[in-house]
């Protein structure tokens, strides 16, 4: 696995072991890091990543980043996975692959008041790649990416694709507003 390559304005920082990219991204954002920081942990059994944004809008408008990142993930996995793999999104950030829960997106922001402008917003991705135990059927409502026929999808390539597809979604939202995102979401 090689170090991921990101589009301009995005820069990656790898963490290893038990380090939580979401927590690190939130700490870096609170310290005033640049928007576009991608903190990631490419473990053998899990893809953990977080992206720092500086939305310059109030919280209730900035929360559009969660569905933008979700659609970005769906498009990224859809481009890399076999065509028969179904990826569905849940409003709370949950990800489903072939009908079973397979990871989640989560969000944190510098403010909790929906009417306050944000200094930063972080969206995190937690995606199980490989089953933790020897009995994957033990929890039939949960799955992992590789258990669903995606063993050829490399974590670094998926991370790169997620950031790229998310950037396309952000640019589209910036240019056209939320209507295209609503259309994309309904199509999923």
Give the ranges of each region predicted by the language model.
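Catalytic palm active-site di-aspartate
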Residues: 87-99
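A short acidic, often aromatic-flanked loop/helix-cap motif at beta-alpha or helix-coil junctions
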Residues: 48, 95, 153
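Primarily the active-site beta-strand->alpha-helix module of PP2C/PPM metal-dependent phosphatases
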Residues: 39-54, 59, 67
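Long, positively charged amphipathic alpha-helical accessory segments at protein N-termini or as interdomain linkers
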Residues: 1-35, 58-64, 68-82, 101-188
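Short, ordered beta-strand-loop transition motifs
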Residues: 40-43, 88-90, 114-115
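A structural signal for short, well-ordered beta-strand segments
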Residues: 49-51, 93, 123-127
